[in-house]
């Protein structure tokens, strides 16, 4: 059991969720769930057995038959109750999230709230799932289409957003009439288990959300199981490319959000305070472990004179435990911390300057935490490791260019295309940037342009695999299939014999 002033959730051994029951796994192999701020083991996460995974997917397939025939209104009512329960338990969920992932409580609450917004949007499913109709495509004939659920779907979640990403996935999938087999990150399974527990309390039927655990074997099972029709994945490039290739080979839909290298372009006419504060907050916040972190600053022309002030402001941020008054928490693992340090050090050897150096930062009260401080690295070129690779840590890489065209060309040559931002007071510059830049999400004086769920998360190029994006209208499209019906209610069919020619619709007959 985790030690708390008040118990939140039993986490001695994380359980599977199958058929509405939290059951102990018969696994013989377990992952340690480690508090990254203290280095202490707070739970054991099983590698679900093949028999447990098969039982989970078969149960989901059986349960989905009745669920798909439940009216969309009743499915929405379950989501209305669910969003209420999330709100009522938000403090508790944030505390669980902070303990297993390391985020500050404020950031954990934001993580949860951005997922809650997706749950709220699913409460409009009756409108989102509407089909189309054309009357009189031919005499007495109508054609109409509607969206039907796929069946069993799967979600494979990352460590960096333990609440938001699962809530991108299963609420949309199940409100559209599917079942979902969820696999949380083995590093942060506790938040997902709490969200699943609340889903059952809200009235989600047994089997409609099942949860298994594991690593490579669990991923392979999801990619190969014939019952699973679609896979939603968020995580790194290697895993995402693998899941997309293996899943699509087996005939499944796959949407995979992968790595990123998001650039923030600073024009000389930008509001200096807003631009610098935005760069620092979006690159250092969450210890830089966001797929939409603005990790790369591109100063255009005379804006480069602000770089020393940028460094001064960044140097004031301090890491620490998420439940204290810290600016940001630790890295998720020691390996992730060491990798970030390596990329900075290798680039320094190639000529980069480390104006703010967080590589040797310590937090005395928690010496075993995965600590790294804020870093600002300047004089960077596009050939350096800190630019070519995603650091995924609290480091801001700084480059300078002469013109906006130079900045756009740099961004477009980078293989990633998750998001980008420009800071300017010129509508002309902003319009040119949004039109010419090749990125899925563009911010204008907005540092992290992740859209609200009325729209969809729209990465591009090497940052996305699959052609249907997350949440919003596209999320509904991903979890449904279109059926088109042509009906003929002619009051008096003519007995003209069998017609062997291709029928021509659209003519009065």
Task: Label each region the model flagged.
Residues 2-37, 359:
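Hydrophobic face of amphipathic alpha-helices that form TPR/SEL1-like repeat modules
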Residues 38-44, 204, 228, 265, ...:
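Conserved C-terminal structural/oligomerization subdomain of aldehyde/semialdehyde dehydrogenase
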Residues 40-130, 140:
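Glycine-rich loop-to-alpha-helix module at the N-terminal edge of alpha/beta enzyme cores
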Residues 42-48, 63-69, 155, 264-267, ...:
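Short, well-ordered beta-strand elements within core beta-sheets of diverse protein domains
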Residues 238-381, 404, 410, 444, ...:
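ALDH superfamily catalytic-core signature
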């Amino acid at each position: 059991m985790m030690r708390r002033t008040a118990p939140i959730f039993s986490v001695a051994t994380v359980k599977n969720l199958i058929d509405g029951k939290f059951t102990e796994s018969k696994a013989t192999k377990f992952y340690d769930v480690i508090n990254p701020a203290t280095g202490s083991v707070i739970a054991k996460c099983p590698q679900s057995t093949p028999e447990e995974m098969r039982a989970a997917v078969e149960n989901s397939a059986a349960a989905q038959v009745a669920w798909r025939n439940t009216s969309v209104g009743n499915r929405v009512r379950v989501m209305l109750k669910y969003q209420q329960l999330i709100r009522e338990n938000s403090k508790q969920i944030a505390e669980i999230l902070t303990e297993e992932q390391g985020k500050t409580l404020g950031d954990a609450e934001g993580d949860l709230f951005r997922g809650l917004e997706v749950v709220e949007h699913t409460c409009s499913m009756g409108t989102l799932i509407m089909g189309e109709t054309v009357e009189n495509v031919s005499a007495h004939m109508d054609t109409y289409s509607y969206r039907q659920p796929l069946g069993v779907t799967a979600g494979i979640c990352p460590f960096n957003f333990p609440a938001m990403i699962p809530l991108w996935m299963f609420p949309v999938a199940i409100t559209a009439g599917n079942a979902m087999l969820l696999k949380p990150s083995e590093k942060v399974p506790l938040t997902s288990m709490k969200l699943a527990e609340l889903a059952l309390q809200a009235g989600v039927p047994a089997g409609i959300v099942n949860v298994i655990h594991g690593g490579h074997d669990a991923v392979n099972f999801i990619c190969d199981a014939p019952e699973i029709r679609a896979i939603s994945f968020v995580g790194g490039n290697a895993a995402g490319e693998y899941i997309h290739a293996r899943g699509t080979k087996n005939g499944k839909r796959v949407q995979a959000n992968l790595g990123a290298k998001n650039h923030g372009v600073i024009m000389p006419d930008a509001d200096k305070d807003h631009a610098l504060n935005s760069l620092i907050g979006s690159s250092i916040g969450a210890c830089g472990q966001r797929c939409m972190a603005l990790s790369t600053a591109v100063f255009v022309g005379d804006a480069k004179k602000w770089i020393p002030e940028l460094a001064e402001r960044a140097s004031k941020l301090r890491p620490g435990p998420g439940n204290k008054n810290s600016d940001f928490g630790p890295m998720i693992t020691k390996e992730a911390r060491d990798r970030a340090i390596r990329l900075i050090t290798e680039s320094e050897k190639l000529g980069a300057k480390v104006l703010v150096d967080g590589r040797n930062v310590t937090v005395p009260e928690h010496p075993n935490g995965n600590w790294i401080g804020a870093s600002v690295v300047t004089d960077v070129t596009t050939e350096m490791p800190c630019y070519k690779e995603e650091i995924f840590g609290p480091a801001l890489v700084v480059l300078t260019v002469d013109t906006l065209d130079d900045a756009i060309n740099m961004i477009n040559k980078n293989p990633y295309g998750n998001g980008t931002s420009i800071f300017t007071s010129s509508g002309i510059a902003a319009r040119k940037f949004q039109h010419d830049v090749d990125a899925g999400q563009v911010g204008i004086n907005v540092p992290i342009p992740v859209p609200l769920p009325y729209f969809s998360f729209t990465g591009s190029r090497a940052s996305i695999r699959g052609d249907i994006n997350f949440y919003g209208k596209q999320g509904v499209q991903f979890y449904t299939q279109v059926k088109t019906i042509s009906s003929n209610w002619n009051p008096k069919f003519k007995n003209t014999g069998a017609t062997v020619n291709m029928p021509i619709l659209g003519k009065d007959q």
